[in-house]
Amino acid sequence: EVEVITPNISRWGSTAIFGDKKSSCAVRGLQPDYEKIEAQNITMGRFINDVDILENRKVCTIGKRVYDELFPQGGNPCGQYLRVDGIYYQIVGVSLSTSNMNINAGTEDSVTLPFTTMQKAYNFGKRIDLVCITVKPGVTVTSIADKIEQVIKKAHYIHPDDKQAVIM
């Protein structure tokens, strides 16, 4: 019934720095399959991949507003390093698209890290802010919402009657 399920973690109020340029941003930790939830429209470089996840690579993609503020002269920044919250990340991709979703930060305002890298860099442990799900054709989310909620609660030892832990 479920086609894609992928976690999302984020942090607001960060600053990305490249040389003497700064950009306020959100930092998102995503899995490669997030692209199946929301197309990233990478125009330079690439998106986060499985090797980045497995090796906890310090790489990132940057959104349109972050790119415009850090690289006002334009050009391809892939291979360059920017600093966010005291940690250097190599830019591997740029998304010049605007986001359809603005939950936990839109693409254009974000520096996106591999999910596992963000977990370690910010000491998030097993924290997940958002779980994004798509369902197979012909299935509605409302038809399986209760089942999804039960699975999440069971997997994370949340009491079945707790109405605040999981919001659908």
Segment roles from a protein language model:
Residues 10, 21, 75-76:
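Residues that act as N-cap/strand-start positions at coil-to-secondary-structure junctions
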Residues 23-25, 166:
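Short active-site oxyanion
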Residues 160-168:
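Juxtamembrane "pre-transmembrane" interface segments
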Residues 3-4, 41, 167:
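Conserved beta-strand segments of alpha/beta enzyme cores
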Residues 16, 26-28, 32-48, 52, ...:
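Mid-to-C-terminal secondary-structure elements
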Residues 1-12:
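Membrane-proximal extracellular/periplasmic loop immediately following the first transmembrane helix
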Residues 14-20:
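Acidic pyrophosphate-coordinating catalytic loop
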